[in-house]
């Protein structure tokens, strides 16, 4: 399903943990990393597509996450000319994306990249919040920057609410 401007509707998923780190996934058989994302099927809402992609790509279900936020607007990126499939109709020149910020509520062990016969990813790791903006493929960088900027206050508030261990330098004990 491609819109009149040549953009394929898509969802992007940022999964964070309680420490404010985000899940960074390695594309299957490649050296490139990105957030989970995928197309919206006809008749499917963006949220329904997000849950479907979440399971297909990283093996998580509704019970494993909670939605913290979604982008206010659709964000677009154009594919480099070398990646456009000019011989298919209609021609897709890029993606328009609705992004979701999720908090992982279950254990890391629930993440499973092998739920599909053709997995999208073959590895993952937790990275610092802004790391993906510098590391993603260049044609997605502006969208990633905008997504992370929009979600930053939510993730930082989540971090601020995480209990600090007593031996942490951030923990201050009142002196009598």
UniProtKB/Swiss-Prot annotation:
User: Which residues belong to any copy of the Nudix hydrolase domain?
Assistant: 6-149
Q: Which SUPFAM superfamilies match?
A: Nudix
- Keyword Ribosomal protein appears in the UniProt entry: no
* InterPro entries xref list: Nudix_hydrolase, NUDIX_hydrolase-like_dom_sf, NUDIX_hydrolase_CS, NUDIX_hydrolase_dom, RppH
Transmembrane stretches in the record are none
Position of motif Nudix box?
A: 38-59
One GO cellular component from the entry? cytoplasm
Instruction: Please report the name of this protein according to its UniProt entry.
Output: RNA pyrophosphohydrolase
Organism, by scientific name, is Escherichia fergusonii (strain ATCC 35469 / DSM 13698 / CCUG 18766 / IAM 14443 / JCM 21226 / LMG 7866 / NBRC 102419 / NCTC 12128 / CDC 0568-73)
């Amino acid at each position: 399903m491609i819109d009149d401007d040549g953009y394929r509707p898509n969802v992007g998923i940022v999964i964070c943990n309680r420490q404010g780190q985000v899940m960074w996934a390695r594309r299957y058989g490649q050296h490139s990393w990105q957030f989970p994302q995928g197309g919206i099927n006809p008749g499917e809402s963006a949220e329904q597509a997000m849950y479907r992609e979440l399971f297909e790509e990283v093996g998580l279900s509704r019970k494993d996450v909670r939605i913290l936020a979604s982008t206010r607007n659709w964000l677009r990126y154009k594919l480099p000319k070398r990646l456009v499939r000019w011989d298919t109709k209609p021609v897709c020149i890029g993606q328009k994306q609705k992004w979701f910020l999720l908090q992982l509520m279950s254990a890391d062990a629930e993440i499973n990249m092998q739920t599909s016969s053709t997995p999208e990813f073959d590895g993952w790791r937790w990275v610092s919040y802004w790391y993906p903006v510098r590391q993603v493929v260049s044609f997605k960088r502006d969208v990633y920057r905008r997504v992370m900027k929009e979600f930053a206050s939510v993730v930082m508030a989540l971090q601020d609410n995480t209990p600090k261990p007593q031996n942490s330098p951030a923990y201050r004990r009142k002196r009598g």
